[in-house]
């Protein structure tokens, strides 16, 4: 039994390593990601927004292709893109002061580069790349940036106005030219690949990592790219038996809407004969509950708690900005990735709040539900901030505020403690940590930290981010102010990094298997529901996957070895591909049988020269080469495996 677990872990770890080294691709991955002729993709223009805001600002591949277009066609457009890239780098750069000052100086030098600086160049080279910016905007920006070079911490919004105006300039003529170019046709080809059907053959499956509410969660790998994911199965009969169709579809739709580095992402959704499948971000580092009670019993240090609390706060801020209420914050729902960053997972209880109207419903986990949920009152985003308070308390103290781990106590008693008892603080809490938890665990929602401001739902996170626990240093605990911009960009080094050779999950045989569901039959109405669920790739995660695994860089070629534009981007290229005119290259057996037929015919002619009576050659098959090739391949029993 132990051998089975060792084998499962070894295969899984090897797959993880190959995926990280870009070696997990199938040998035939290029066949799977083969572009069609661009004319086949033109109908997709009616299905997407052909705007700068959508194609360039929201689509990762669209942004790269637009920058390639600008670099290849117009020096002014290219310099605009360079300016935008440098500003984005500046706004998310290290907050140590000097690096930002140096970067600010390099951006200012771009604004100083007027035509007279290069009198020997051509007219195009001398064109002032930012001529669309007024002298006032440029001078104000340069003055502010020059003064910032002497500040300890330069402001992050120095270039906000020229950045906005540069984007506005690129939205007009440059983007219109891009939309008529082969670079946009290539974007449509990527979108065509993105929209292809997904099924179980798209992935390789590995060991079971855990159990969900309706099925197993296992590791999987995309054959075409080698990227690893977590596959969450929802058994169809189990979902139907519990009348959880709406709940399952709700989780899938919310995951599809959210694109946050602090919330697990949905990359694919498809169905098999027995299950609905969600392909999610793989978090190899385990959950906070495992680390808190198995690796660090007694609690984390405040520096580590601050890091996790900050990333969780950003995750909730992203959810709240989409009007999504999470409602199930607890250590087992916070997962660590390979590098130690955390994400919120399991959005099964999440719900959309419409028109900012409070909702009602007793959902959540005992000991983590806010008092208003326990009292069955109406509630809003404040219940999530209560959950953050419970989580911070547990990470510091090593136990939950209203229930100790494995304590045998009735649900009613835990709910009474939540409603009436005041949590107790030990010497483990600094003053800042204590005031933060007390503010988050206030029994009255109107006085709770994160709920005191009247404004947008995401403004509650700003109130928490301004707390001294996140914005002041503490020499005793080693806590430092959180560089929020840097953290949002994922550039803060986590205080703990999981071991890449470890599997932070139960042994395979220790994970209980689901019993067989009996007495449930699937019918036509279920098929309609599955159609809503089975939507294939999710756009942004899929494009990011293509970029991260270098599939984009390897396939995104515009010219062949002879310097000609690729056939699939040429108007006449559709006639160059044999597959488009109904023929295909003869297979091995087709060529072999044809060769045998020719040899027999030649031998008959040779016999006639010897005086032997002439025989009629065998009748030539009327089948087309494509049919012969297809039948020959079928006879051989070969199947295309990607």
Swiss-Prot record:
Name this protein carries in UniProt: G protein-coupled receptor kinase 1
EC annotation from Swiss-Prot or TrEMBL: 2.7.11.16
Gene behind the chain: grk-1
Entry's family note: Belongs to the protein kinase superfamily. AGC Ser/Thr protein kinase family. GPRK subfamily.
Database matches in Pfam families: Pkinase, RGS
Residue span, AGC-kinase C-terminal domain: 480-545
One cellular component term from this protein's GO annotations in UniProt: cytoplasm
Domain Protein kinase residue range list: 203-470
SMART domains: RGS, S_TK_X, S_TKc
All residue ranges annotated as the RGS domain in the record: 52-188
């Amino acid at each position: 039994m132990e051998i089975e677990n060792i084998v499962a872990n070894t295969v899984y770890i090897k797959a993880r390593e190959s995926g990280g080294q870009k070696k997990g691709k199938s040998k035939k991955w290029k066949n799977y990601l083969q572009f069609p002729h661009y004319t086949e993709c033109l109908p997709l223009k009616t299905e997407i927004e052909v705007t700068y805001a959508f194609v360039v600002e929201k689509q990762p591949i669209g942004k790269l292709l637009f920058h390639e277009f600008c670099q290849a066609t117009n020096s002014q457009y290219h310099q605009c893109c360079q300016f935008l890239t440098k500003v984005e780098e500046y706004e998310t750069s290290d907050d140590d002061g000097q690096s930002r000052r140096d970067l600010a100086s390099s951006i200012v030098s771009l604004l100083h580069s007027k035509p007279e600086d290069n009198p020997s160049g051509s007219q195009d080279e001398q064109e002032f790349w930012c001529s669309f910016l007024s002298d006032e905007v440029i001078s104000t920006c340069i003055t502010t940036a020059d003064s910032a070079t002497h500040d300890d911490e330069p402001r992050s919004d120095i270039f906000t106005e020229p950045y906005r105006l540069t984007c506005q300039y690129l939205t007009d003529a440059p983007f219109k030219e891009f939309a008529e170019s082969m670079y946009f046709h290539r974007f449509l080809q990527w979108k065509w690949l993105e929209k292809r059907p997904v099924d179980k053959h798209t992935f390789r499956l590995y060991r079971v990592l855990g159990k969900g509410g309706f099925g197993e969660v296992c590791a999987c790998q995309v054959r075409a790219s080698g990227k690893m994911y977590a596959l969450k199965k929802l058994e169809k009969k189990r979902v139907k038996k519990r009348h959880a169709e709406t709940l399952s579809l709700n989780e899938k739709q919310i995951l599809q809407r959210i694109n946050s580095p602090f919330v697990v992402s949905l990359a694919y959704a498809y169905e098999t004969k027995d299950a609905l499948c969600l392909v999610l971000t793989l978090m190899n580092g385990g959950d906070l509950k495992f680390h808190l009670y198995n690796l660090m019993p007694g609690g984390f240090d405040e520096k580590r708690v601050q890091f996790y609390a900050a990333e969780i706060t950003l995750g909730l801020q992203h959810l709240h900005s989409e009007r999504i209420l999470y409602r199930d914050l607890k250590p087992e729902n916070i997962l660590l990735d390979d590098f130690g960053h955390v994400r919120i997972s399991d959005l099964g209880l999440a719900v959309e709040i419409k028109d900012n109207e409070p909702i009602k419903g007793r959902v959540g986990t005992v000991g983590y539900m806010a008092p208003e949920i326990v009292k069955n009152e109406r509630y809003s985003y404040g219940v999530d901030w209560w959950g953050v308070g419970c989580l911070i308390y547990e990470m510091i103290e090593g136990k939950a505020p209203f229930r100790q781990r494995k304590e045998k106590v009735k649900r009613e008693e835990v709910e009474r403690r939540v409603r009436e008892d005041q949590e107790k603080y030990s010497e483990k809490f600094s003053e800042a940590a204590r005031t933060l938890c007390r503010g988050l665990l206030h029994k009255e929602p109107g006085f709770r930290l994160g709920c005191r401001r009247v404004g947008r739902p995401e403004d509650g996170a700003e109130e928490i981010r301004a707390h001294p626990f996140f914005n002041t240093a503490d020499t005793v605990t080693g806590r430092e102010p959180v560089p929020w911009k840097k953290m949002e960009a994922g550039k803060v080094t986590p205080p703990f990094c999981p071991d890449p050779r470890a599997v932070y999950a139960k042994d395979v045989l220790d994970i209980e298997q689901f019993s067989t569901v009996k007495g449930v039959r699937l019918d036509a109405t279920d098929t309609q529901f599955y159609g809503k669920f089975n939507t294939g790739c999710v756009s942004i995660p899929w494009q990011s996957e293509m970029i991260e695994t270098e599939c984009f860089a390897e396939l995104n070629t515009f010219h062949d070895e002879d310097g000609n534009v690729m056939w699939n981007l040429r108007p006449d290229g559709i006639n160059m591909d044999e597959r488009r005119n109904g023929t295909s290259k003869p297979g091995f057996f087709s060529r072999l049988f044809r060769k045998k037929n020719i040899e027999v015919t030649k031998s008959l002619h040779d016999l006639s020269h010897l005086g032997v009576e002439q025989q009629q050659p065998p009748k030539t098959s009327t089948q087309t080469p494509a049919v012969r090739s297809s039948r020959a391949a079928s006879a051989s029993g070969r199947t295309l495996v990607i």
